[in-house]
């Protein structure tokens, strides 16, 4: 939706897709989506092979990374779409609210970061 809109929307006589900062926002979004996707696949693989208990650190990483990524990408899409981004035609405002809620659904990010940090430090010696 965001990338398609860059080909349609114009400012100062140029398509959005011609602006380097817009291309950068699209590129960053693509990278963040792929990072979260690969982390999720890695976690699923670890869960399948070793079980959920052994995968708890990577599961915590996903619970931190995925909702945060979704918020950032949706926010960029809203920004690029302008007023249309918060209108009823795109549902982006609704998705933004859902993504924000997901950051709290299984405990706030800080809880996951605390536990993950503790686990990582413990793996290097007694805490």
What residues fall within each predicted segment?
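Alpha-helical interface subdomain recognition
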Residues: 1-127
